[in-house]
Amino acid sequence: MNSNEDIHEERIEVPRTPHQTQPEKDSDRIALRDEISVPEGDEKAYSDEKVEMATTNASSNFGSNESAKDGESIGAFSNPHEALMQSKLREESQSKTILPSDDLSQQLETEESKVEEALKRITSPPLPPRADCIEESASALKSSLPPVLAGNKNDQAPLDRPQLPPRQVVNAETLHLKAPHGNATPSKSPTSAVGNSSSSTPPTLPPRRIEDPLDLAAQKHFLASTFKRNMLFYKSEDNSIKCDLDKNILNLKEDSKKINNNEIPEEVSSFWLKVIGDYQNILINDIETLHFQLSRGIPAAYRLVVWQLVSYAKSKSFDPIYETYLTEMAPFDVQEFENQLKMMDEVPSEYVKRISNVLKAYLLFDPECEFSTDIAYIINMILDVCEEEANAFGLLVRLMKVYGLRLLFLPSASEIDILCYKFDRLVEEFYPEIHNHMVEKGVRSSMFLPGFFTTLFQKKLPTEIQPRIGDMVFLEGIDSIMRILATLLSNSRDHLLKMGFDDMLELLKSGLLDAYIKQNDGTRGDTLLSNECMDKLLQDSMMKVAITPKTMKKYSSEYEEIHRLDNEKEVQYKSITEKNLHLQKHVRKLENDYTSLNREHVTIANELVKNRLNIESVLNENNGYKLQILDLKKKLDSEKKKQVLGVYVPNDLKKDLEETMKKNTQVMDENLKLQDRISELERLIEEIKTANKNGTLFEYSNSKNNPLGAGWSGFKKVFK
């Protein structure tokens, strides 16, 4: 059930409209409500509303004495309606006695139902939007109310009337008026005039995201970021390699306990033993101490163990690889390289062959990496720490592959440009005067900076200090070297600001260390003072130059964003160049094809000319033949005409031919008979001759009994 205060709140909200300052219109509204039929149970609610309307109209007069009395209490509220409501509730609470809990609950229920019924029947002008009102509830309430009755035109508010401030919800908890505790039944949640209910249940918060302490440390310290990168490399390896690395790490931890640390202070020795025992825990809980101890250098007795532990460089797999590459042919002139090493003051003579072996093995291991004498300085630093060449090879592989140093020795060497940009931004942020002077004189970091990174600053530092650079690189990464250069620039600030292009470039290339030693009361000839100056330089660079991995990452993102368009243009240019080369090859091919086709065309054209000439000759010959044929046809026609005119052919030629053929047949038969007779007579003549010769008498015998003259009679008939 609602409390008594909620009832007063609902009653006050009903007449609170922009027309409260017009008594005539309020009276019209009261009269209009009186005309509406009201149930008997709601008469009290309407009478209370009339009283409240009159009270509101009276309070709207600014010159009333009552408002002057309550000026202080009303002034405490930013909204005058809230002040009026507060004063009215305070008066009613003083005049009324507190009812028992059961009676109070019943009365509250009754009053709430009356107020709800009255609100349904009351027609009021639209109120200004409330700050805590929900749009859906307001639209629902507006649709449920009856239409507003038209009033008198003279009652309309003037156009220059100020708007009232937004209404605020005032509930029992705000006024500190609560129902008495006891056996009272639980009351309903208070309902506002627009129908939205207040809820005491707070919204459920999303689960809190707990950041990894190592990730948080990796944003602020190079120590943690480098360890995190090495951990990612470790997790990416095969299980067999992981087992080998884990086994060797345990061996390193056991070997570290056997190291003779008598010459090392106990505090320093115990700290580095803790680092070796649980490096990740030190990074999370005591990274500042680790950074401080690193600025003073890792003790020489623990240096190799720490390097191999942090970089995961202790692996048995490097031994057979190194031995295999030693037997192969080097990708460079070994003799010439060794002669160059002998000329270097920083390289001891006993390291020449060992440096050559390690460099040969690595270049065979990583063929993409180009040969450079600067790598010899890095190998020399590693050999100062470890005696075995295989261990030096493993450290060099990790330094190149995992720490990204190989990117400086690739043919493109794009990483150098990124490092130069990072250094420029670092100088611009920490030493803007030096940066502006360098830009003004045209000196760019790419003119002097690459040599420091490719040699890891080994070319300029004394031999005793060189392993300290290895401490920084293996534990913090390559970006940590920028601290040294930034410290040297800061130390030579006054000299740099007075120099021109040539002098400044010469100082930046080779004179920064000399200037630092000279300024700190040391000389190159005094080795002790020089080492002390270099030690101070490293400490100052690590403790005073505050750069973070987050800053370096921001610089890298800036570089990528700046050069993104350039890279896109370069990629586009390369693609266009490749396409152009392809098109040029295609053009050459087309030209060759065109040349061959042109030759074929010339040959075919020549043949065509010859064929045309032959065709002309054939056509001429053909025309001659045609003329000859025409002449022959004419002659033939003339001959035919002559034969037709000169010869008479009778009509019964066929019959004559048949008769002639028959006669010819008969003649032929007779001819055959005569031929036979001639043959017989010739035979007879021969017999007669033979008989005469023999002197015998010839006797003629005719077997056919034909007279000798019978045949001649037939012959005569033929020729009749």
UniProtKB/Swiss-Prot annotation:
Q: Where in the cell is it found?
A: Cytoplasm; Bud; Bud neck
Cellular component terms (Gene Ontology): cellular bud; cellular bud neck; cellular bud tip; cytoplasm; Golgi-associated vesicle; incipient cellular bud site; mitochondrion; plasma membrane
Keywords, in A-Z order: Acetylation, Coiled coil, Cytoplasm, ER-Golgi transport, Exocytosis, GTPase activation, Isopeptide bond, Phosphoprotein, Protein transport, Transport, Ubl conjugation
According to the record's subunit comment, the protein's assembly and interactions are: Interacts with GYP5 and RVS167. Is part of SEC4-containing complexes.
Name its GO BP terms in alphabetical order. endoplasmic reticulum to Golgi vesicle-mediated transport; exocytosis; protein transport; regulation of exocytosis
Q: PTM Phosphothreonine: at which residues?
A: T17
Show the coiled coil region(s): 572-696
Output this protein's name: Probable GTPase-activating protein GYL1
Positions where Phosphoserine occurs in the chain: S37, S73, S139
Task: Please give the residue ranges the record annotates as the region Disordered.
Answer: 1-132, 144-164, 179-210
The keyword Cytoplasm is assigned to this record: yes
Q: Which organism is it from?
A: Saccharomyces cerevisiae (strain ATCC 204508 / S288c)
Where are the compositionally biased (Basic and acidic residues) regions?
1-52, 111-120
Q: Gene3D superfamilies in the record, alphabetically?
A: putative rabgap domain of human tbc1 domain family member 14 like domains, Ypt/Rab-GAP domain of gyp1p, domain 3
The family annotation for this protein states: Belongs to the GYP5 family.
Q: Which residues carry this modification: N-acetylmethionine?
A: M1
Cross-link entry Glycyl lysine isopeptide (Lys-Gly) (interchain with G-Cter in SUMO), positions: K498
Say what the protein does. Probable GTPase-activating protein which stimulates the GTP hydrolysis rate by GYP5 of YPT1 and SEC4. Involved in ER to Golgi trafficking and polarized exocytosis.
- Listed GO molecular functions? GTPase activator activity
Source taxon at top rank: Eukaryota
The miscellaneous comment for this protein is: Present with 2010 molecules/cell in log phase SD medium.
Q: Which residue range or ranges hold the Rab-GAP TBC domain?
A: 297-477
What's the main place this protein lives? cytoplasm
Biased-composition ranges for Polar residues? 54-66, 95-108, 184-196
